[in-house]
Amino acid sequence: MAYVKGGVWTNVEDEILRAAISKYGLNQWARVSSLLARKTAKQCKARWTEWLDPTIKKIEWSREEDEKLLHLAKIFPAQWRTIAPFVGRTAHQCIQRYERLLAEVAGEVEGEDASAVASAPATEGDQFPETKPARPDAVDMDEDEKEMLSEARARLANTQGKKAKRKDRERMLEDSRRLSQLQKRRELKNAGIDTRLSKRKKNEMDYNADIPFEHKPARGFYSTAEEEHENDSERLQHKQMHRTAADAPGPSQKRDKATLSKEDEEKKKEQQKTASAQRTLQLAQLDLQDQISKRRKLNLPEPQIQDQEMEEIVKLGAQGEALHKRYADGVASSLSGDYDDKIVDDSIRTPQIQQSKVKTTIEEIKAMENRSVLGKRTEEEVDDEAEADKDGFAIPKLPSNKAVTSVSAGSDIGGATPAGMTPIKRDALGLVGSVEATPVSILRQKLASLPKPKNDFEITAEDEEEDEEADKEKKPTDNLPVDKGEQARLKRIAEEQERQEALKTRSQTLQRGLPRATVPEVTYNDAIGQEVVALLREEELRFPNKGDSVALMQSEFSLDDLVDAETLIEMELMEGDEQEVQEEGIKTAALPGTVARSDESEEEFKTRVEIISDQLVETLTSLAETCQTEETALVDKFKAYAKRQATLSKKLTSRWSQLESVEVEIAVFSELARMEEIAIEQRSAALQEEVDWLVKKERAAQDKYRELKVKEQAAKGGH
C-alpha cells in the first residue's frame, strides 16, 4: 500500500527542516524535502512560510490589525495572499481571524485569546497541519523516523561537497604560492636585488598598487602644464641619448604592438556598443519614471451625506412643501418662508460619535454578504474605499451637515460655528440676528481694505553692471602674489599679438614663409619694375635675414594704407582683361640667360623655351649622375671611419653611464660616512652618560655599604 505524504508535523521534522533550509536556502525545496520522507516539497515550503519563518507574528491580534483586516477584506474579497503582507500576518492567520470575528458578531463563540487558539496542537484530521504547532516526539520512534533522522544527520554533517573541497584546496595552494613568492622577494630585497612580481601590460592596472579612476586636483592657483611638458621632453631627450642599438624593438615586439592596437580597437567598439545600449536603457527607465510620477493616486473626498440622511431630508422637504402649497393663498402664507435651493456646500465636521468601529465594519460586511444583488457595490462602499488613508485605514464617517441650509440673505458668512451654535441657520424670515464675524472674515475685510498695488516700476541695469564690475574688482585672488609663470605666459601672448600685427604690414612672401627673391641688378625703365625693385630692397632693410647685421627701419606705411592700396590694385585688375595681361607677360618675359625680344612671335618663343628646357634637363641629369658617383666613392672611403665612430660612441656612452653610477655611489657613501660619524658621536656620548651614571650609582652603593658596615660593627660592640 502506497504511503500518502502529509499529516501532522513532528518536532523532529521541524528541526530537520530548519537545518536543511540553513544549508540549501529557500529555493531548493526539492532537496529540502528529500530529507523528509513523509513530506513533499510543497508541504515543506508551506510549513516554513506558515509557521517556522521567524518573521511570522504569533501574538494576539490588536484592534488596529482587526480594523485593517476588515477594511482590506471589503476591498479585496477572498484575496488573502494579497491582504496578508499589508496586515503583517500569514494568509491562513488572516482567514482564521476573519472567520472568528464574523462568528463573534453572530454570537456563535465568545472572544478568546488568539494566541491560545493558534497554539492548539494539530490533530490527524486537521485540514491545514502546516499552520499548527509541532507534535511532541514519541519516546519510542518508528523505524522509518529513526532512519530519516540518521540519514539527515549524515547528509547535513557533510557541509562541503567536492566542488567546495576543490575550491578550498586551490585557495590554500594560492596562499602558499603567494607566501613563498613574498618570502623570496623579501630575501632578494635584503640582498639588494629589487624585483617585481609581474610586468604590467599596456592599458592594465594593478588594483593593489594604483587607484582606479583617480582624478588628482590641481595644485595652486596657476597651471604648471607647460613646465611639466618641458620636464618630460628633457627627460625623454636624456633617455634617447643613453639608448643603445640593442634597445631597438624587434619584429616580435612590433607584432605585439600591432596585435595590441587591434585588440584596443575591438575593445573600443565593444565599449561603444555597450555604452549606447546602457544609454538607451537609462533613457527608457527615465521615461517610465516620468510616466509613473505623472500618474497620481485618485483621492476622492468622503461622502458628506448618506442615503438615510438624504431620505430624511427629502421627507422633511416634501412635508414642508406640502404645507407651503396648502396655505400659500391664505393669510398664513406670510408665516412660512421659501427654503428651496438653500442647501449649502460647505462641510463642517461635528464631534465623532463614540462607537465600536470593528463592530460597525463587521455589520456592513454581513449586510454586503446578505444582499440580493451579488457582485454590485453601492456608491457608499465605493466612496469608503476611495477615502482610505495611506496606511490602509478608512477615515471614520462623521455626521454630515448637508442637511443644514444657508443663513438668511443678510448674512454673508457660511460654515462658521460661533459660540457653539448650529453652523448655518435656516432663517428665511430674518427672525434671528446675523452671525458674528469670525477672525477669518475680519482678516479678509482688512486685507480687502489695503490699497491696490502699483506696477509702475523702472528697472535700471547700470547699477547691477557697476555692482558686477565692483565684485569682479574685488576678487579673492587680487591679494595673491602673481605667479612668474603666469607673467611669462601673458608676456608671450602679448608678444605674439604684436608679431601678428607687424606681420600684416609685410609682403605675402614673408607672411607665408616663402623664400625671398634676389634683388635684380637690371635697371627698369617702367614705373612698375622700379617700384618692385624698391619694395624688395626696402624689405631687405626692414626685415633682414637671420645673421645679417642690418639696422631695422620703421615702416612708412600703416596697415590702413596697405589695405587701401590693395583695394585699388584689385579694382584696376577687375577693369582690365586678365587673359590679355597674361599673354603680354608671357611675351615680354625673359628666360634665365636670355634677353627678351619684342619682335619675337609666340611660336618662336615656345620653340626657344623647349630648347632651353631640354638643355636644362640634360645638365641636371649629368649633375645627378656625377653626384651619385662621388657619393658612392665617399661612402666606400669613409665606411671604416663611420664604423670606428659608432664603436667609439658606444664605448663612450657605456663609460659615461659607469662614471655617473660611480659618482652616485661616491656621493651616497660619502653621505653615509658623514651620517655614521654623527651617529658614532651620539652613541659615544650616550654610552659615556650611562657609564658615568653607573659609576655614580656604584659609589653611592659603596658609601651606603660602608655606613651600614659601621653601624653593624657598632651594634655588635654595644652588645
From Swiss-Prot:
Ranges for domain HTH myb-type: 1-56, 57-106
A Pfam family: Myb_DNA-bind_6
MF term (GO), any: DNA binding
Disulfide topology: none
SUPFAM superfamilies the record matches: Homeodomain-like
DNA-binding region residue numbers: 29-52, 80-102
Biased composition, class Acidic residues, residue ranges: 459-470
Regions of compositional bias (Basic and acidic residues) in chain numbering: 167-189, 253-272, 471-487
Subcellular location per the Swiss-Prot or TrEMBL entry: Cytoplasm; Nucleus
Alphabetical list of SMART domains matching this protein: SANT (SM00717)
GO cellular component: cytosol; nucleolar peripheral inclusion body; post-mRNA release spliceosomal complex; Prp19 complex; spliceosomal complex
InterPro entries according to UniProt: CDC5L/Cef1, Cdc5p/Cef1_C, Homeodomain-like_sf, Myb_dom, SANT/Myb, SANT_CDC5L_II
Functional summary from the UniProt entry: Involved in pre-mRNA splicing and cell cycle control.
Subunit structure: Associated with the spliceosome.
Protein's recorded name: Pre-mRNA-splicing factor CEF1
Encoding gene per record: CEF1
